[in-house]
A protein has these predicted regions:
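Short, compositionally biased
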Residues: 92-115
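Glycine- and charge-enriched low-complexity intrinsically disordered segments
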Residues: 110-130
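Residues that flank catalytic or metal-binding motifs in active/ligand-binding sites
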Residues: 46, 81, 102
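Short alpha-helix capping/helix-loop boundary micro-motifs
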Residues: 68-75
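Short, basic/aromatic beta-hairpin or loop at an interaction surface
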Residues: 51-66
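Extended boundary segments
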Residues: 2-55, 127-128
Length: 130
């Protein structure tokens, strides 16, 4: 066996492939690296790469999670419809049950999402599958 490279292991998407970038503008991800990477410190599990909608954002604000208002002190620009963002898997699932779930980029959605939402449900919202 070879020596460890010191690099973290490749994280995989829900399709079992290396995870692709979700968004750099605005920069997203729990680690603010543009990817929906996750790890032990991500207690809220933010692995879902979604294209936000007005309906989802309004629903999120009414549930107490304001993703719209800029918070410059945290480097958060505020989000708008059309932005891509790494969402909490449980929040996406709740939005799905309420009929407000945004569409997804499965190639940029971390495989940990499958612990909350089945792949057949995710595929119904995929923007990047032909």
């Amino acid at each position: 066996m070879g020596e460890p490279s010191g690099e973290p292991p490749k994280q995989l998407n829900v399709l079992g492939l290396p995870i692709e970038q979700c968004c750099q503008d605005p920069v997203t991800g729990f680690f603010r690296d543009g990817h929906c990477h996750t790890g032990p410190m991500d207690h809220g599990l933010h692995p879902v790469c979604a294209q936000l909608t007005d309906a989802f954002l309004a629903s999120s604000v009414s549930a107490g999670n304001d993703l719209v208002t800029p918070m410059p002190q945290y480097g958060f620009p505020g989000l708008k419809a059309g932005d891509r963002w790494c969402l909490c898997a449980l929040r996406w699932h709740q939005a799905h049950e309420a009929g407000k779930a945004p569409r997804l980029y499965l190639r940029a959605t971390h495989q940990k999402t499958l612990e909350i939402v089945p792949l057949n449900v995710l595929k119904q919202f995929a923007l990047d599958l032909s």
